[in-house]
A protein has these predicted regions:
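Short, Lys/Arg-rich, polar N-terminal cytosolic tail immediately upstream
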Residues: 1-13
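N-terminal TM1-TM2 helical hairpin plus the immediately adjacent luminal interfacial "cap"
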Residues: 14-119
Length: 119
């Protein structure tokens, strides 16, 4: 058994396929919104009472919009530092399913606790 720590943790060399795809998707949506001034957050955001407006699809899209650059950066840093290890352990398909399930369950939990009218 080796006591050496991996040297590529958090480096771009350690980025796995699903993590890379999610990074590109999240950053692209943020840039489209900011540079082209297309209000994707209005389309993708999760209203607190999504069931009243039949915004079921928002449960699957809200996780790709971010309030500001800091919000995006912190989320993507978490994805870069934790995602590859999880993806390598459970595989790309299961990682993607876990990412989506976590997002959907997080959205459901948030909508139960959020005040009406919140995004």
């Amino acid at each position: 058994m080796s006591n050496q720590q991996p040297t590529n943790i958090g480096s771009m060399a350690a980025i796995t396929p699903s993590v890379k795809f999610l990074l590109i998707l999240n950053v692209s949506i943020f840039l489209i919104e900011g540079v082209l001034r297309i209000p994707l957050s209005r389309l993708f955001a999760l209203p607190a009472v999504w069931w009243e407006t039949w915004s079921f699809g928002s449960l699957f899209t809200y996780m790709f919009v971010h309030a500001n650059g800091t919000h995006l950066m912190v989320n993507m840093l978490g994805l870069v530092f934790i995602g590859p290890a999880v993806e390598q352990t459970i595989g790309s398909y299961r990682f993607f399913v876990l990412y989506y399930l976590s997002g959907v369950l997080g959205g459901l939990g948030w909508s139960l606790l959020a005040q009406e009218g919140a995004f």
